[in-house]
């Protein structure tokens, strides 16, 4: 597996050529290989907003974690990575740089020079990949393949619904509510 950070929009500088990076990324996304994310809806929404298309299966480790342990209190990457990988996210360097620049390390990360974000982003990728190695074994051991595959197969439809919206028959919903209650 490979991890890397390819900055294109940092206000603090250190960006690579946006057009070349997006072309390269699209070449990877158009392959039929499995793409692994944590909280895939967030990343896939950004990818689609950039006008890029994703082929291949999309695996979400957040969904995998919920399927394998529905009673868990938290499904964030840091918590799950500590449990399954034995390490968490690499936030110290990012927080230090953000403090120096006087910005919020999460919501204003783009304002930092890319040099300060690369290690953080790469660690997220490493943690996600490691988490998937554990989750896929859990799914098999708990005989949850069918459930996880259903969730995974529905994901592209959920993304489309988020982007296109969903029509709701309000009158029909109100009638159904009266019937159910």
What positions do the PLM features span?
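Extended, well-ordered alpha-helical scaffold/bundle regions in very large, multi-domain proteins
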Residues: 146-181
């Amino acid at each position: 597996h490979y991890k890397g950070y390819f900055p294109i929009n940092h206000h603090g500088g250190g960006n690579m050529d946006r057009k070349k990076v997006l072309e390269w990324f699209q070449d990877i996304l158009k392959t039929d290989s499995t793409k692994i994310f944590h909280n895939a809806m967030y990343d896939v929404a950004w990818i689609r907003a950039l006008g890029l298309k994703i082929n291949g299966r999309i695996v979400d480790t957040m969904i995998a974690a919920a399927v394998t342990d529905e009673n868990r209190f938290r499904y964030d990457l840091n918590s799950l990575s500590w449990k399954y990988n034995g390490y968490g996210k690499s936030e110290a360097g990012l927080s230090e740089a953000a403090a120096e620049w006087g910005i919020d390390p999460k919501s204003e990360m783009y304002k930092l020079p890319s040099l300060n974000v690369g290690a953080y982003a790469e660690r997220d990728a490493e943690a996600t990949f490691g988490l998937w190695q554990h989750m896929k074994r859990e799914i098999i051991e708990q005989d949850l393949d069918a459930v996880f595959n259903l969730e995974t197969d529905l994901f592209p439809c959920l993304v489309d619904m988020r982007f296109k919206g969903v029509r709701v028959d309000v009158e029909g919903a109100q009638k159904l509510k009266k019937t159910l209650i």
